[in-house]
Amino acid sequence: MGDAVIDVRNLKVEFFPEDQHLIAVNGINFQIPRGQTLGLVGESGSGKSVTALALMGLVGTPGEVTAGEIYFQPASDTPPIDLLKLSNAQRRNYRGGKMAMIFQEPMSSLNPVYNIGFQITEAIRQHQKVSPSEARRQAIARLQEVRLLPSDDILRQDCLLEDNSLSESEVNHRINEQKRAFLERYPHQLSGGQLQRVMIAMAISCNPALLIADEPTTALDVTVQKTILNLLRDLCQARGMSMLFITHDLGVVAETADQVAVMYQGNLVESGRIHSIFTDPQHPYTKGLLACRPRLDQTLAYLPTVSDFLTGDGQVKTANPTLQWQDTGIGRESADHDNMRGEDSSLVSAPLLTVQNLQVGFPLRGIFGQPKRYFMAVNGISFTVYRGETLGLVGESGCGKSTLARTLLKLISPLHGQIFFSGENITHWQGKRLRRLRRQMQIVFQNPYSSLNPRLSIGKTIIEPLNIHQQYQNSRQRKERVGYLLERVGLSANDMNRYPHEFSGGQRQRICIARALALNPQFIICDESVSALDVSVQAQVLNLLKELQDEFNLTYIFISHDLSVVKFISDRVMVMNKGKIEEIGSAQTIYKTPQTAYTRKLIDAIPTIEKQFKMSH
């Protein structure tokens, strides 16, 4: 196996649910050279995560590794071992020790009952015969290595800057107290990026030769994602550690991996050096994955899909992209002046939604429950959304995007400011007027599975708003409306009696879009509505949203932390930071000539293939 840390040969994983038979991984072969990173890419259901679980020995019933060999060589001076020939007890000695894994959602991987110090020291003592105090020392060292805790030297400098009269023993006491306080924090007290660093610290605590990272940055915004990717890359270089990096984001792979392997329906269809595969792909599926990504350097009327390439139509559909926005240089707005459109703007229409000096705050209460002050999630913003346009809303987690969306939908009451919809002041609407407004404003959420009732068939889910608002004369007409909507979003009227769990993630999001359209709204907020989808399904949903907008004259606010997606779908972009508007302008202008350092930071943090390889086509 040369100097490979792992050598996978003819690996086959099958599932036997009830009387069915599914081949999830179909005889794949790959190696990961020592000290290098292999990016494993493909759509949801392609077999990526099952491959990782097979390496870790975690494929559970009804799954089974039915063929193949997995040769693992933690050190170059030790002979390779076929992991599939080891007993469960022997496999446990490698799992978490010489081979470790971090998952997509750290909150579900960490036990909420125990503090992070306990969980890291437990992992250390599971694989090393060390005392509790030594395990604690190692846990602190790992947290410093992943940059959650400052180094001892920095902690010492901070203590002396705060009070230079402290004695050496007092300084040491303060340093130890800071370390202890961090170890005693619980998962719910940390942000998503901090939690992922805790998972990385736990994974590297026993010096693994191979780290498997399964979608570790998918749930993070671009700036936090960039920090985590840089950290993983630095750790691999410093430790000589190999990594299997699983993702559906090809830009992330381009910035992280040395080699890439592409999976499709359980098969490995293409593999090689990262530059070679991404600049000259050979397999139609790889070409499709690359083409269906929204790109910052292109303005397309719609995105190609993977199926275009698998059917041989991709080259025609991607040629000569149509501009969706002709930038006239007019439309750049400051955060202080809401002069959104001039007479020469390329998209002139009447305002649908106008927001004036909006403030939304959450009370921070004192010891007796009285509000002492307010945390301002949205702090004095003003903007206008025009009929038929898409306003992209971007910013880091916690900047106020979702709070703003809920306020516009009248789910949260503002402290100050006014909201006008179709020329009417809706700020304080209640009762019948608010009920009437609900028909005109809808939302599509990020997670389609959690926003659909698992006990209701999709037909009942979509017909529910029609019943509530007493639309159409009878149940037959309502069912016809549901059937039409399902057909319009790319499903079948025959799916009406099926349940959410019977659909894929992309299909469930189409169901949510159909439900949002049921009442013929004028205005829809898409709150991270494609963030949970892989790149090929994302392209299909984005194309669908644009088609529906043209057909029904819809107006969107599209919220996302993926700036390349926002650029593709939006006419204008509004950047939020700490509850305020950084800048607003046409999508083209914002990305070509951002006016604020914060916007430039967001754009620079986007992982793209084009940045890595200077691709011009």
Language model: regions and residue ranges:
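Conserved ABC ATPase "signature" region
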Residues: 136-181, 476-494, 603
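Conserved ABC transporter NBD signature motif
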Residues: 65-81, 417-425
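ABC ATPase NBD coupling module
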Residues: 77-100, 126, 277-281, 368-372, ...
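Conserved ABC ATPase signature
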Residues: 159, 186-190, 499-503, 507
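Conserved catalytic motifs of ABC-family nucleotide-binding domains
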Residues: 207, 520
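Short catalytic/signature loops enriched in Gly
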Residues: 4, 80, 149-160, 173-183, ...
